[in-house]
Design a protein with these regions (language model features):
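Catalytic donor nucleotide-activated moiety binding site of glycosyltransferases and closely related
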Residues: 36, 45-58, 180, 202-232
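Short internal beta-strands
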Residues: 29-35, 126-128, 211-215
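A donor-sugar binding/catalytic signature common to diverse glycosyltransferases
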Residues: 85-96, 106-108, 241-278
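A nucleotide-sugar donor-handling region in carbohydrate enzymes
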Residues: 126-193
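Active-site and donor-binding regions of nucleotide-sugar-utilizing enzymes
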Residues: 5-21, 35-140
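Donor nucleotide-activated moiety binding/catalytic core segment of transferases
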Residues: 71-76, 217-255
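C-terminal amphipathic helix plus adjacent low-complexity
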Residues: 305-333
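Catalytic binding pocket for nucleotide-activated donors in carbohydrate/polymer assembly enzymes
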Residues: 261-307
Length: 333
């Protein structure tokens, strides 16, 4: 079969890389990618060839909508013939697949930001067990038979079989550090009047070595004047960052969940008022600390200790997901 993967954001690369590695043994793989954040460098890191289509359009809702329409048009013109599509969120893959009358598979763990057309046009939906799928059935008319659940988190998929790089610390100028990744202030799910707390975090952690991973070029300015802050000049392995850092502090959820599954203390200073179900579960288990108060965060980090790694369970989750994917592909062979 010809399987088309569309990759539009950095976490998508990590999630799809092991799946592509498995499926390419028996299938032809087509990959399209959007130029955003570290998406393209990571595809190169994993050795995945891609067709470049589109770029990020910033915070403007109008530009996002027009950009989506233009990219869908470009995909219709540029994507070779395929038998089934795989996408995260499905905003781009479902219209193209529907137009070409091909099935689509949508992966997501986001149960607070719903993409109407993805659920109306999608064929199969693959969710983690901790997902409010009843709402999808009620609000969008998705059938229960279209929904496939795996008993884990999406981060389990690419942490399966992970082995720490023994030379990773050669990339850094210090032996012990915490990591800070800013909020994604340009994302739709972040309130427009949100201000970053990263400068405040830098102040309270002024005596701690910090690996700073800015999302956008302009965020580098936050670190000016601090000798304890290091910004890498190349893309680092996110998994190794999460493993070796003393604590992971992030303005979103993915890095926090990755770190938590590796046993690393994690802090989310996500600015939204509503959290994903997967993040609520992480908080309930004590794996992720959620706060936007710099002093509270400082006290948590000061006393934080490593937890047990979940890697053995992650391997089981990955195998479970592969069975789900193979069962879907068998329908269309």
């Amino acid at each position: 079969m010809n399987i088309w993967f569309d990759i539009t954001n950095t976490p998508h690369v990590h999630f799809f890389a092991p799946i592509i590695g498995h499926l390419k043994q028996e299938h032809e793989i087509i990959v399209t990618a959007r130029d955003f954040s570290e998406t393209l460098p990571l595809l190169k890191f994993y050795g995945i060839d891609y067709i470049l289509t589109g770029s990020h359009k910033g915070k403007s809702r109008f530009k996002k909508i027009t950009g989506l329409a233009v990219r869908i048009r470009d995909l219709l013109n540029r994507v070779p013939e395929f038998d089934i599509s795989f996408g995260i969120g499905g905003q781009n893959t479902t219209p193209v697949s529907a137009w070409r009358r091909k099935p689509s598979v949508i992966f997501t763990d986001n149960d607070i930001s719903y993409k109407w057309h993805s659920y109306k046009l999608g064929s199969h939906f693959v969710f983690p067990f901790y997902f409010d799928y009843e709402r999808v059935i009620k609000n969008f008319g998705v059938k229960r038979s279209q929904i496939h659940l795996y008993n884990g988190f999406k981060e389990d998929i690419y942490l399966a079989n992970y082995t720490p790089d023994p030379n990773f610390m050669d990339n850094l100028p210090f032996k012990e550090f915490i990591t800070i990744r800013p909020e994604n202030l340009k994302a739709n799910y972040v309130p427009e009047d949100t201000e970053t707390i990263v400068p405040e975090l830098f102040k309270v952690f002024k005596d701690v070595n910090i690996l700073f991973l800015p999302r956008y070029e302009e965020e580098r300015a936050y670190a000016e004047g601090y000798k304890n802050i290091f910004i890498p000049d190349k893309v680092l392995s996110g998994k190794d960052v999460c493993y070796y850092t003393k604590v992971m502090l992030t303005g979103a959820g993915t890095f926090a969940r990755e770190a938590a599954l590796l046993g690393t203390p994690a802090v989310s200073f996500f600015p939204g008022k509503t959290f994903l179900t997967v993040d609520k579960i992480m908080q309930e288990r004590g794996w992720v600390f959620i706060s936007r108060n710099p002093e509270e965060i400082f006290q948590y980090v000061k006393n934080a200790k490593r937890n047990d790694s979940q890697l053995e369970r992650s391997n089981q989750v990955f195998q479970e997901l592969l069975k789900i994917i193979n069962s879907i592909l068998d329908i269309y062979k």
